[in-house]
Amino acid sequence: MDEKKVRSYLKSKGYEINDFAQSIISEAGDWYRLKETGAHKKFNLNLQPYSLPRMGFAKRAAADDANLCEVIEINPGESAAAFIEDFMRDNQFTAQYRKQLELMSAEGTVACYVYLKDSELYEDGFVRGGDIRLAYVEATGFLPITIENDDITEAAFWGETIEKGKKKTVLVIFTLDGENYVCETVVFGEGAPESTVIRLGPVKPFAVMRNAEVNSIAGMQGYGFPKVYANIPLFYNLDAAFGAFFTDIEKSEAITFINEQLVDFDEDLKPISQSDERKKRFVFLGEGLPDSKTLIHNEQPNVRIEQFRKSIELLLDILSMKFGFGTKRYSFQNGQVQTATEYIGERQDMMLELNKQRDESRQYIDGIVRAVLWFSNTFKGTSFPLDDDICVEFDDSYIEDRASKLENYRQDALSGLGGMHTRALYLQEMYNLDEDEAAKWAEDAGFDDDEDGA
């Protein structure tokens, strides 16, 4: 991606990329993507270089966050339901949204904008035809231009596309002209930049999703809190702890201590310098006059299992206070790691914090859907209502398992709540019946504590 051209063009428009924010986002992204950082490069006592293992705890933590904000249904109302379902499927929204959830947890911010592909631009600045598409943007390709009460009303987005094997960098700038949006698209290819300006309407053509946790890092206005960046010391020490543990296991074979005088000689009886391989296999004790102890002897190291277990558990406990939702989220007990998605099923108090993030996700999806409907009405001649409520349903399977759900139905049925409908619902879930069968069972059979099959 030609970031220099993007930077130069934005500067010509009076916009400056926030280098401080981008450096933090990039560092968080490196840990999320399991890139080898400078902190992973080490030297042993013999000055042999080695690298700490990259355990991917940052990726795991971000994925765990994403699990709790998965969406299973978007309902924009009866009239637009089929259109939105097909549109989201064509734009791979489910897969891209999942990817964005992880990136948001790691880097703090993701975005999406609506555009027309292969459209025709008329002299009056309006466009006709084309396909409505979604463009998904990472934090490294996002610049908030105008922020009002933490609401981003104007922004720039950039990224790389490939057309017929050729890479192009696309910059899109959304600004307001009165109450209506103006979109400027700049394509940087092999030749001169190609710029196109079109006039849109009052509906915001983009949406930004940020970490719901307050961003306490000064100088990152408009960007969400990058949770991975805030926890880099913990992720590093987890890598270091596992690296030392793996080293213990690797070196649990016998170590041979050998005197420098026990070396190979060449044909002229000159000592051959020690190879790197020999330095890995032996520990040399110098060339001093050897005794029986220093000439050569072996030792069998122990694997410090209990010490590593306690260290890793402590690090995960600290991580629990800083990452995820609620309070205690991770533990390492009896050789097993309990993750946040497992823990949330036991602690409903975590829902309070989780719902804040779900509200952010709900607003993000709401903004995308309304923009898509406006584009469809304006450029495709449809007449979908833009003011209807858009319902977003999240996947709660991590929070309430099937057994708990059935028990709730059972208790409601026994108490008479909901009458025949609740009884049928319980039987349908319990015995995997269809609606008609469940209704007949509920009507024909008695429903008491001894006959409910539980």
Regions found by a protein language model. Give the residues of each.
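Extended, helix-rich architectural segments
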Residues: 1-137, 452-454
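Extended, non-catalytic structural segments that build the interaction scaffolds
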Residues: 25-29, 33-52, 287-322, 338-363, ...
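Short amphipathic alpha-helical segments
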Residues: 79-80, 88-96, 104, 230, ...
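Extended, regular secondary-structure scaffolds
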Residues: 111-225
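Extended, charged amphipathic alpha-helical segments
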Residues: 196-345, 393-394, 401
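Short acidic alpha-helical/loop segments enriched in Asp/Glu that coordinate divalent cations
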Residues: 324-338, 367-388
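Short, basic interhelical loop/turn and adjoining N-cap
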Residues: 431-438
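Extended, compositionally biased alpha-helical segments that mediate assembly or anchoring
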Residues: 440-454
